[in-house]
C-alpha cells in the first residue's frame, strides 16, 4: 500500500463550509476515488494556520493521478475553489509532504 500526505490551504473562516461539503460528498466522486485504488483518505484541519493535511492510502500512484482527469473530480474542484487556494485549473494548490517517521 502506498501512503501519501499533502497540505492545502483553506480560506479564512471556511472550515464549517469545507466540513459540510465533505459530509455531503458526491457518490460519483467516492466511486471514482475507490475505483482508482484509494482505500483510505483522511483530511485534518489546523485552525491556527487554515492548513488542511490529507493522508491517503492507495494501491497505485498512476491510478491516483488519473483521478484528476475524471469529470467528477473536475466538478468537485470547481465546487471547492471558492473556499480554498487553487491552481488555474481549479485543482487545490497542494504540497506533497515527506514521511519522516513510521512506527511499525
Curated annotation (Swiss-Prot):
Gene3D superfamilies: 3.30.70.100. GO terms for cellular component: cytoplasm. Homodimer. This is L-rhamnose mutarotase. It is found in: Cytoplasm. Its EC number is 5.1.3.32. The active site is at residue 22. Keywords: Carbohydrate metabolism, Cytoplasm, Isomerase, Rhamnose metabolism. Involved in the anomeric conversion of L-rhamnose. The keyword Nucleus does not apply. Substrate binds at residues 18, 41, 76-77. Transmembrane segments: none annotated. InterPro entries: Dimeric_a/b-barrel, L-rhamnose_mutarotase, Rham/fucose_mutarotase. Pathway: Carbohydrate metabolism; L-rhamnose metabolism. GO terms for molecular function: L-rhamnose mutarotase activity. Belongs to the rhamnose mutarotase family. Pfam families: rhaM (PF05336). One of its GO terms (biological process) is rhamnose catabolic process. It comes from Clostridium beijerinckii (strain ATCC 51743 / NCIMB 8052) (Clostridium acetobutylicum). It catalyses: alpha-L-rhamnose = beta-L-rhamnose.
